[in-house]
Amino acid sequence: MDSETKPPSKRAEYEQPELDIACVSPRVRRALVSDSGNHCQVWRGGRRSDEQTDGQNNFVEFVLKYPRDSYTDADIRILRRQYEMLRESLGDMVPEALFAITCINGKRNVFVLARAVNIWFNIANPTNREEAVGLLQKYPMARDQLQQFVDVARGWREGPNPRVIDLYGMDNLVMDNQRQIRYIDSFYVFFFEDLLHILGGERDLDLEDKINVSLRRLAYLEEILALSADKQ
């Protein structure tokens, strides 16, 4: 789960943990905005770019995603392939991201650098059903994007090498402040049901729960799409 816009608490502002990334200047300001995800911490920062608008340098906001675990080169190739699959199938719904290997807090590891998404509404939260239906009616582009997301996700589940896209993280699929749908997870974005029994023959109950929650939320997205079409 990746949370990109929730500001740090006042306590967190004074107790920021260290994050020393060798290839990122310490002068680049960033703040920890989420430490609750399954795979990573999320830091948010910004800097002025060389691009200009009306004679003024633009300000670019970005997120740094730092994994909880150490990843091998093979792991990193899997992460990149999965993210590239997202980008190829979902286009601009998935932010551009760079997977970089460097020294982080004294150890070799990977981090993800991506443009920040300003989360406006949690489209995958079933408690927001009525509001979600109204928003999909009001913003047809978002509705088309969500329909594309659902179609692609179902295709992955029903195709060869079946996989379930990670909707377990509540903030993985959102509507941004431009009223467009964004998928913002980065680390291990798919669950594979054929791995449920792979370790010693025992059922992986944690993985099973994540798959079931993701499938329920996918069904919920199909439901709000149908409801928004019925009321048009």
Predicted regions and their residues:
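Conserved catalytic motifs of the protein kinase core domain
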Residues: 59, 107-109, 179
